[in-house]
UniProtKB/Swiss-Prot annotation:
Gene3D superfamilies: Amino acid/polyamine transporter I. Belongs to the amino acid-polyamine-organocation (APC) superfamily. The chain crosses the membrane at residues 26-46, 47-67, 95-115, 125-145, 160-180, 208-228, 251-271, 278-298, 342-362, 365-385, 409-429, 432-452. Its main location: membrane. It is found in: Cell membrane. It comes from Bacillus subtilis (strain 168). This is Uncharacterized transporter YdgF.
């Protein structure tokens, strides 16, 4: 099948199921662990103290339930390739248009931020290289890899995620040895008692604990990426449930395990919020080049986020085009079943975004990324609402689906209540309040564009 297809047979094309079980398992881990754990955890610990562990536990449970609802929806119809497909089915064309372009915008802004970060992290070793050069090189490499086959995307994510896993496991193992041996640091003896002997588990009270959710929730952004791979996964009925069901264990091990060890080695009030706690732990045991090691991990983590962005934005535009919510040329596939036009389009927009990042005032760029994180809450919420509609209108499908969201509809309302709570927290925090009130402008813009397009076609 060639690229020169007519509009009539575009919809007959399908993406290739080239992602294997090992790819999906590591993509699930990579989606749940961002650069925030390595760089931003010092700030979140400083904010909430040991109570941050409970915030991660609660948010991890909610994200697991969101993923269960997403998994049930995707496996109810194997023709679903993304959020757009089931939103189209259950909430209509306008909701699908808004959801698809919102998710696309979310990942475009993530790519802008992380490509900029790639330049910054590279300058740690090569200070003379202009910041834009490593970012541009990274984008070109990722684009070439994604243009080849979906399997190459999976391979990249597999190794990127593996680097993160090794770094976290190294921290936990080294940390546990330090704790059980009573290792002395400049701050005292490493011990689990450090968790409660410096003001208790809630040293900043409920106020600090509640405000910490703004950082914790954003750490889980991207966890839903597994859902976007369903249409390109071998044997999705077995692989997707396995990846989703492992989320609680991974959250417990990687987030809670790492932070628990860090706060046992160093009392929470000693940890420098502007430094990586990982570097502090590795330096304490005399690991040479600890900062370079973590810089490498964070660099690959940022590259992983960019890779996910290139993949997810192209697949979202492809899905939108299949439903006539984007130019039909974006639905064309190459002989290797890759949406080449959609990939080029998203890569060009990412490149423009990175260029604008150097021109725009810093506050504008920060506002854009803040708006995108608020939009992720919308994506999670719309998924849960679609799940409720599916259960209500397609009970026969729900009966035969082996992968169900537990305790429906209680868990649906629990998720929506939690997301509403996070929005309230965002309104309380000064640095996120503006983005919360500006975000509706994005949705109004999409509604206007949709209405104009519809009127034009009629």
């Amino acid at each position: 099948m060639t690229d020169d297809m007519t509009k009539d047979n575009i919809n007959q094309q399908t993406l290739q199921r080239g992602l294997k079980n090992r790819h999906i398992q590591l993509i699930a881990i990579g989606g749940a662990i961002g650069t925030g754990l390595f760089l931003g955890s010092g700030k979140s610990i400083h904010f909430a103290g040991p109570s941050i562990l409970f915030a991660y536990m609660i948010t991890g449970i909610i994200c697991f339930l969101i993923m269960r609802s997403l998994g049930e929806l995707l496996l109810s119809n194997l023709n679903y390739h993304s959020f757009v497909d089931f939103v189209q089915d259950y909430l209509g064309d306008m909701a699908a248009f808004i959801t698809g372009w919102t998710y696309w915008f979310c990942w475009i802004s993530i790519a802008m931020a992380d490509l900029t970060a790639v330049g910054l992290y590279t300058q740690y070793w090569l200070p003379g290289v202009p910041q834009w050069v490593p970012g541009l090189i990274a984008l070109i490499i990722l684009l070439i890899m994604n243009l080849a086959t979906v399997k190459l995307f999976g391979e990249l994510e597999f190794w990127f995620a593996l680097i993160k896993v090794i770094a976290i496991l190294a921290l936990i193992v080294i940390g546990l040895v330090m704790i059980f041996k009573g290792f002395s640091t400049s701050s005292g003896v490493s011990s689990f008692t450090n968790l409660w002997s410096h003001g208790g588990l809630f040293p900043n009270g409920m106020h600090g604990f509640i405000l910490s959710f703004q950082m914790v929730v954003f750490a889980f952004v991207g966890i839903e990426l597994v859902g976007l791979t369903a249409g390109e996964t071998e044997n999705p009925e077995k692989v997707i449930p396995k990846a989703i069901n492992n989320i609680p264990v991974r959250v417990l091990l990687f987030y809670i395990g790492a932070l628990l060890v860090i706060m046992s080695i160093y009392p929470w009030d000693i940890i420098n919020p502007s430094e990586s706690p990982f570097v502090q732990v590795f330096v304490a045991v005399g690991i040479v080049g600890a900062a370079s090691i973590i810089n490498f991990v964070v660099l690959t983590s940022a590259a992983s986020a960019c890779n996910s962005a290139v993949f997810s934005t192209s697949r979202m535009v492809y899905s939108l085009a299949k439903d006539h919510n984007a130019p039909e040329s974006m639905a064309k596939l190459t002989q290797r079943k890759v949406p080449r036009n959609a990939l080029f389009f998203s890569a060009i927009v990412i490149l423009i975004g990175v260029t604008l990042n150097y021109i725009m005032p810093e506050g504008v760029f920060t506002l854009i990324t803040s708006i995108s994180t608020v939009c992720f809450i919308y994506i999670w919420g719309i998924t849960v609402i679609c799940h409720m509609k599916y259960r209500k209108t397609r009970p026969e499908l729900a009966k035969t689906n082996k992968f169900k969201l537990p305790l429906y509809p209680f868990t649906n309302y629990l998720i929506l209540a939690f997301l509403a709570f996070v929005l309230v927290v965002l309104a309380l925090a000064q640095d996120t309040r503006v983005s919360l009130f500006v975000t509706p402008v994005w949705f109004i813009l999409l509604i206007v564009i949709y209405k104009v397009r519809k009127a034009k076609h009629q």
